[in-house]
Amino acid sequence: MKKLLIMLIRFYQRYISPLKPPTCRFTPTCSNYFIQALEKHGLLKGTFLGLRRILRCNPLSKGGYDPVPEEFSFKPRRRWS
C-alpha cells in the first residue's frame, strides 16, 4: 500500500505538477516531504505527517525549511523563526 501511494505521488510530480505554477511554500516540497515521511515512518504515520504538511501549505503560512521529523509525534513542531 505504501508503494502504491508513493507511485501516485510520483505520478503527480511527473505529469500534473509541471502543468501548474509552483506554489509550495516549503523546502522540501510537499510531495517530496510526503514521500520522505512514508519512507521514514511507514504508511499510517507517514500519511498523517504528509497530510498535515499539505494542510499547512497555504497562503497564510510563512513556509521555509521544514524537514521530516526524526521522531513521530501527533503534536506539530513549534517553529520560532
Swiss-Prot record:
Main location: membrane
Subcellular location: Cell inner membrane
Membrane topology: Peripheral membrane protein
Database matches in InterPro entries: Membr_insert_effic_factor_YidD (IPR002696)
Coiled-coil stretches: none
Record keywords, A-Z: Cell inner membrane, Cell membrane, Membrane
Cellular component aspect of the GO annotation: plasma membrane
The keyword Cell membrane appears for this protein: yes
Its biological purpose: Could be involved in insertion of integral membrane proteins into the membrane.
Family designation: Belongs to the UPF0161 family.
Name of this protein: Putative membrane protein insertion efficiency factor
